[in-house]
A protein has these predicted regions:
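Bacterial N-terminal signal peptides that target proteins for export
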Residues: 1-9
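Bacterial N-terminal signal peptides
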Residues: 8-17
Length: 326
């Protein structure tokens, strides 16, 4: 049996097991009132070698996630069974679902050195596109120049769509792409439950903007300062609390007013987070690295980028915002 086949079998067998193995940290979750109970346990939902980024919950209580290097969108159903949801995604690195049920992705094209050599050559640059039910490019340029490597995206109930690509941008209702500031070094991007506030990571700071339904953003301000680490993928709960992935530090939680509430530690460095599951009270998070078929930390040959990832889940007291997928 090949190593890939064995790896899939191990992932299925141990996908729901508590994860205490070589290459990960033992963590203790402390209470954050109204957010997570003391002693709550992370479990593995999925692990694999082909990446998992830009997580978004589905209406059925499952998960979609971008797998950039094989150019696919992966899917977990409500029981954490994995399948390939979409193929030929042009190197999608993040995915979301709008109010019309369309699958929208930040497509990174050929910008990652770990891209599979088995894929056909690509000539188009990064773009924000609808992938399903019909494919449509929404943005591929800013001020006449091709977009840089894309990171994350969010779309409001009203259709406002904003994304990060080095800095941060919004797509106005007329299709114009507007930048939010050349001095922003953004990765994660998120909207408040009422779609009126846009949150943007800027290294150790979270910025906030007022945003209108047409995608116009204004009133830039500092929302919060991270307690260690740099901001990455974000999500939001029904009470408007913001959850920020910060690598080895964990998932930092902030009130709607920007007050730091606490950190949920993760066994691995975290880069993406999303609510899903029954009643949207399960928090999913992507951790860097995974177990190989031998039960040890997966390694690649020297010089080959390691895209192995583990998706964890944890029961929450807080409920994710149900008004949007992300």
């Amino acid at each position: 049996m090949g190593s890939k086949a064995m790896f899939v079998i191990l992932s299925c067998l141990f996908g729901s097991a508590l994860f205490l193995a070589q290459g990960v940290k033992e963590v203790t979750v402390t209470e954050i009132p109204g957010v997570v109970a003391a002693g709550a346990k992370w479990k593995i939902a999925w692990q694999g070698t082909n990446n998992a980024d830009g997580l978004v919950g589905t209406a059925e209580g499952g998960l979609l996630f971008a797998q950039e290097q094989p150019s696919t969108i992966g899917k977990l159903d409500k029981d954490d069974h994995y399948s390939v949801f979409l193929k030929d995604t042009h190197g999608a690195g993040s995915v979301t679902i709008d109010s019309r049920g369309r699958i929208i992705a930040a497509q990174r094209s050929c910008t990652d050195p770990g891209r599979s050599a088995n894929l056909p050559p690509c000539t188009e640059g990064p773009m924000v596109s609808v992938l399903a039910p019909e494919r449509k490019v929404l943005a591929d340029k800013f001020q006449g120049k091709p977009l840089e490597r894309l990171n994350d995206l969010v779309v409001g109930k009203n259709g406002a769509l904003c994304f990060s690509a080095g800095t941060a941008y919004c797509i106005k209702s007329d299709g114009e792409v507007v930048g939010l500031g050349n001095d922003i070094r953004s990765n994660g991007i998120m909207l408040s439950p009422d779609d009126k506030t846009l949150y943007v990571t800027n290294n150790i700071v979270i910025l906030a903007f007022d945003v209108k339904p047409d995608g116009t953003a204004s009133n830039r301000r500092e929302f919060a300062k991270l307690q260690g680490g740099n901001g990455d993928g974000m999500t939001i709960d029904a009470a408007g609390r913001l959850y920020v992935s910060t690598g080895a530090v964990g998932i930092q939680v902030f009130s709607p007013e920007g007050k730091y509430l606490g950190t949920i530690p993760l066994p691995r460095d975290v880069a993406s987070v999303a609510f899903s599951g029954p009643d949207k009270k399960t928090l999913y998070a992507q951790g860097r690295g995974a177990l190989g078929p031998d039960g040890k930390e997966f390694r690649t040959p020297e010089g080959v980028r390691n895209n192995a990832k583990t998706i964890y889940k944890i029961p929450m007291l807080a409920q994710g915002f149900k008004g949007r997928a992300k």
